[in-house]
């Protein structure tokens, strides 16, 4: 490990040690926690499972018929000095049918064990730190295609690393009007990928403006940067502390970086810009959100408009209603800042600068793909972000090389509520037109294949299923050209209880 990465590791360990030292001198109070165990059976009219039966479920479900088991425990509490702590461990495994040319499991395996959660967290006032593997919460009651974040949807497993983040902090010069929050973290991508042991940096800053009583605007920028690792073509990539600083500011690479990284930015950078408006009243909330992807400066500068995920969500605060949540999403990613990424210099430009033969115009953003980090924005064969972007089939080495379909037009609608005020349910249906990629070589997408996927899920209440038992049923169906026409069912049995103090 290079000195720069040693520095990062020491910094993370030191930060955790400071928190732990504070914990050990005080007695915990307000402790809570529990354990859970689940078994799930997954059936289908074909070998493959319908899209929504395995999508946005933490990356642990197989994509062919089979069974899944998982279990774990977690806990949290607060010490007398105000420091909070949390911990969790979760394991999962499945046995599923072998894949075929038409359907296959993303990781290429029919039997697999996984670590879903393994973390320790500590917090103080508005700050929180988590170290390990921890799933993030999703927004919009499970009805959205993205869960409220098109770059991090919950479709893949979580990454190992550390995350330092804050709750909303009021600006001292504009209290009750302006507040902000941030994310900062570093992770490792340890799956079988093109650039082995790729490092991952994340930083995000969001702000919130209280326009009037009940009307709030939220905006922000979230950046993810893949860097370091070992390329099969270029060898070990720069990953010193100086290189880490370059990655943080999206600076160009120094000596030892590839020619492309020296001209552009070191590593593979992508992210999203968030524009959101919430109107909240005593009984309900209405949200409109525009989630914009970017791969370079053209996207950050809104050159890729109208690309993005547009979400309209209406939610009653009373969740015991027959209908408590309604959602409608329109997804458009066809433009990608234009049809050309660069152009040759004109004769006049060559006279002024003979060494500059190519000019970047910023098009062909090619979302979730990269020329050097060829696995792109995938993890264990699954798309990390918007799951309607279809990942490439694994090559002969078992490596996923990005996504093959990132130019789409899609609609998604969802409803959630409680039947008879007792049985929670969700219904969603998704329709997409798929255009592949710019300058694609796969003729399959020339015909613009269409796809419809639907889901109906419900959970029996404890008073019906038993005090410590959960019974959940899911019905799913696919119709179209992207996935085989199938209907599927999942039955989930769960047990759990709280720890006794």
Stretch-by-stretch model annotation:
Residues 47-54, 98-104, 111, 141-148, ...:
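Outer-membrane beta-barrel translocator domains and adjoining extracellular loop/strand segments
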Residues 261-501:
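Outer-membrane beta-barrel pore domains
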Residues 39-47, 91-97, 103-105, 124-126, ...:
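Transmembrane beta-strands of outer-membrane beta-barrel pores
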Residues 189, 216-276:
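A conserved mid-domain beta-alpha-beta active-site/ligand-binding segment of alpha/beta enzyme cores
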Residues 1-32, 498-501:
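Bacterial Sec-dependent N-terminal signal peptides
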Residues 25-136, 143, 150-152, 158-170, ...:
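Beta-barrel outer-membrane channel/assembly domains of diderm bacteria
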